[in-house]
Design a protein with these regions (language model features):
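Hydrophobic, aromatic-enriched interface-forming segments
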Residues: 117-120
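Conserved G/P- and acidic residue-centered "switch" motifs that form tight phosphate/ATP-binding loops
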Residues: 114
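N-terminal beta1-alpha1 cap of cysteine-dependent amidohydrolase-like domains
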Residues: 1-111, 122, 129, 133-165, ...
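Active-site-proximal beta-strand elements of phosphoester/diester hydrolases
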Residues: 213-216
Length: 240
């Protein structure tokens, strides 16, 4: 009988403020669920919890997916908040950092998207541009698109020989919904994709002992119209 890997999606919270319902909801974006299902994996949400539970959560899944969401707190990398910093969620930051550390200890593959890339970099000692429009001198690409999310709006260049290039080739168009980005890349990682203005759009692990692919765009919003972006989910499940 065929078995399917269990993938933990690090979840987020939202507040339902309707008259009938005033609950805090734990959720994961449906694009991640669909991408994993199409790749023949079983998605489960890992709700934001006590960081002490991270070891147990990671022990029960075969891989960790880090999703998008709030800005990462700059206090985690020794900076004060910039005037253009958006909403942060320290409890989510703390929990996901422990999930990342446990995934490393247990050698579980990681796929990180947008904020997921950013918290992964910070968790291992990297830093971020808190707001690229005001802090990154060479910006010349719009990284917060107004076009519908299923449509790519700028291109990236990908390092040949990288895991990412096996899936996407050496150049591809992507969508873009971020105002933060990698500034100093953590020593454990190697950059493998860049926008035309030099922003790091993806990185991978230097070590063969830890499988990591992290991307700055949102492939989960492109998979219905792009088989090539579904390939990122297929690749993740293959790495499990």
């Amino acid at each position: 009988m065929q078995t399917y890997p269990l993938i933990g999606i690090a979840g987020n919270h939202r507040q339902d403020n309707t008259e009938e319902d005033r609950y805090i909801l734990s959720y994961a974006a449906n694009g991640f669920v669909r991408g994993l299902e199409k790749a023949k994996a079983i998605p489960v949400i890992i709700p934001i919890s006590n960081p002490e539970f991270a070891k147990e959560f990671i022990s029960r899944v075969d891989g960790l997916l880090l999703a998008g969401g709030q800005d990462v707190s700059p206090l985690l990398y020794g900076e004060e908040p910039h005037l253009n910093l958006a909403r942060t969620y320290p409890a989510r930051d703390a929990f996901e950092i422990e999930l990342i550390k446990e995934a490393y200890r247990q050698h579980k593959p990681i796929f990180a998207v947008c904020r997921g890339l950013q918290i992964l970099n910070v968790a291992l000692g990297g830093t971020l541009y808190q707001d690229i429009e005001s802090q990154y001198e060479n910006i010349s690409v719009k990284h917060t698109q107004k076009t519908m999310p299923s449509q790519p709006t700028h291109t990236i260049q990908i390092a040949s020989g990288s895991e990412l290039s096996r899936v996407l080739g050496t150049t591809t168009p992507v969508n873009s919904y971020h105002h933060q980005a990698v500034k100093q890349l953590a020593a454990d990682f190697v950059p493998v994709a860049w926008s035309t203005d030099g922003i790091i759009e993806a990185f991978e692990s230097k070590s063969k002992d830890q499988s990591v692919v992290a991307v700055q765009w949102h492939p989960e919003l492109l998979i219905e119209d792009s088989n090539i972006m579904q390939g990122l989910f297929d690749n993740f499940v293959e790495r499990v």
